[in-house]
Amino acid sequence: MREQNSAITMNRRETLRLSLVAALTGTSAIPGKIQAMQDSDMKAISLPELPPKPSGDVAAKLFPGFEQTEVRTSGASIRVLYKGAGPPVLLLHGYPETHVTWHKVAPRLAERFSVYVPDLRGYGDSSRPADGDRHLNYSFRAMALDQIETMRHFGHEQFLVGAHDRGARVAHRLCLDFPKSVKKVCLMDIAPTLTMYRQTNQEFATKYMWWFFLIQAAPLPEHLIGLDPQYYLEYNLSVLNKTPGALTPEAVSEYRRCFCCTSTIHATCEDFRASVDIGLKMDEADDRAGNKIVAPVHALWGARGTIGPLWDVLATWRAKATSTVTGRSLDCGHFLQEERPEETLEELQRFFGTV
């Protein structure tokens, strides 16, 4: 039985690989092979709609002393962990992770700051709203409003922001839509979304293939990822992480718990669809209006990742900001806060320290 299950798993992974090739290249010969495999043993995989309930032990271990609650915003229910006293700091995660990505940094940061670590809508244990017209409910604007309302729930009209990957794109929108709320912003391992799409080349499209796969119309990406979501998730993490062992088993287990369900797979696809549809329209409108970030910006990126080698990161953000833009690379891949937590903590403390 174990050998049979292993063979089925391998067939599912081969089907996922072939399906991706067919979807991204328009190849017509491959689907016949896929269909043959599906007819033999590729029965529909039964995935839960929502993530299983989290274990309190995991939260206590990864975020000792943090409290957690759900904040009802005007468009979603946001799960957030919080701890500390001092200037408020909002930490935002990216794809395909959750707030857990901050587990090596947030507890130490909470020694000096009031730290808030939410799951973005559609991710982790936050809710999954309906898509909305042109994927509006998963736009960075909708996600930014969640964060404003979450911080106001805790009594904060102004705050500091540290954000990674998709969360950093939410932070960019937060700075544009609510300029008086963000005192400083640290943007990690991204260049501006509009800049990246406009300057896409073969190397970027190859290394960040999910940027172009996930924007395809439903249910294509959802179906293909759903064939083996654990493999897809762990492949994504492995190609972006350049520091062996940096992603702890406890963290990966949480990413797996939250990602491997139908609602998360769909919601995270909607995130990418929104960014390339209505999100780019919003960015273009800001460019035309001269709407730029007014808060001081500190950019960090992985020297062994994709963004730094392909873009002049500081130059891209100076083009989008009116205040000072500082930053540097760290010797790692994409997941700075997990691969280089001590340096990331030092950068955040230094940047946020003079408010």
Put a short name on every predicted segment.
Residues 1-10:
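N-terminal secretory signal peptides
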Residues 12-20, 24:
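N-terminal export leaders
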Residues 39-69, 75-80, 85-88, 116, ...:
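Flexible "cap/lid" subdomain of the alpha/beta-hydrolase fold that forms the substrate-access gate
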Residues 86, 94-97:
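Active-site glycine-rich loops that stabilize anionic/oxyanionic intermediates
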Residues 110-120:
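Active-site machinery of serine-nucleophile hydrolases
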